[in-house]
């Protein structure tokens, strides 16, 4: 459980960072309150032994959208097997790329499940979105930020569920598969863009032009001594214009 809580905190920190909120003065409303049982995420309800399937994940996001005017659930494409690629938008008056750019919003993209068996990011993101919907995270953080969350990127691979997808990983009991239904690794496809999922993602990226991008992964049982590790680009990915 600790690593999921830390992940949600990392993303909350990223939101605070781009809004200029300092760690010395964190938002406090409702932060110490226990989460009501009806708002526990599917993974929390199982004591993190299970991760929700695609339909359950989308249904939980839609519940959050019904509970909070800040949250909207949409999609940015269709997978080869006909599943929508989900996108959750958290904003105040910047729910489209045009609105976000016109209002000079900072855009933060959090992407989960590019390797669908690596589900910690997805489950942590659902906790984060729940805390936003229930007021545990200060809404004023979104006066100047739009948060985009992709709960599951590799949706078809996610539904190739089984107990042996990542046999060295410490839970959950079952999880999705690394590659897509076309056996493509989306994390190796950004340039060649063979997958329809990648092409949809590139359209999303070009439309929103995020200022900050978080891409979550999970180790396959490696003992790294840390609950969460952060890595960032140190070099440009393309020549300067």
Residue map of PLM features:
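Structured catalytic-domain cores with a bias toward divalent-metal coordination
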Residues: 2, 7, 23-241
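Bacterial N-terminal signal peptides
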Residues: 8-20
């Amino acid at each position: 459980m600790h690593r999921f809580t830390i992940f949600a905190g990392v993303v909350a920190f990223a939101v605070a960072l781009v809004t200029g909120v300092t760690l010395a003065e964190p938002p406090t409303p409702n932060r110490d309150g226990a989460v009501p049982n009806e708002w526990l995420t599917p993974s929390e309800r199982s004591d993190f032994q299970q991760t929700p399937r695609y339909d359950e994940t989308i249904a939980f996001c839609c519940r959050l959208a019904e509970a909070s005017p800040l949250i909207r659930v949409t999609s940015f494409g269709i997978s080869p097997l006909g599943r929508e690629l989900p996108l959750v938008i958290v904003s105040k008056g910047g729910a489209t790329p045009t609105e976000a750019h016109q209002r000079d919003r900072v855009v933060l993209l959090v992407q989960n499940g590019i390797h669908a068996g690596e589900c910690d990011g997805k489950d942590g993101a659902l906790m984060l979105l729940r805390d936003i919907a229930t007021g545990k995270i200060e809404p004023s953080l979104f006066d100047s930020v739009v948060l985009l969350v992709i709960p599951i990127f590799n949706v078809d691979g996610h539904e190739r569920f089984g107990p042996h997808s990542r046999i060295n990983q410490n839970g959950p009991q079952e999880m999705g598969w690394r590659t897509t239904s076309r056996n493509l690794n989306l994390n190796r496809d950004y340039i060649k863009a063979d997958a329809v999922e990648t092409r949809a993602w590139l359209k999303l990226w070009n439309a929103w032009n995020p200022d900050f991008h978080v891409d979550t992964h999970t180790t396959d049982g490696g003992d790294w001594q840390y609950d969460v590790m952060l890595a960032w680009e140190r070099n440009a990915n393309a020549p300067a214009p």
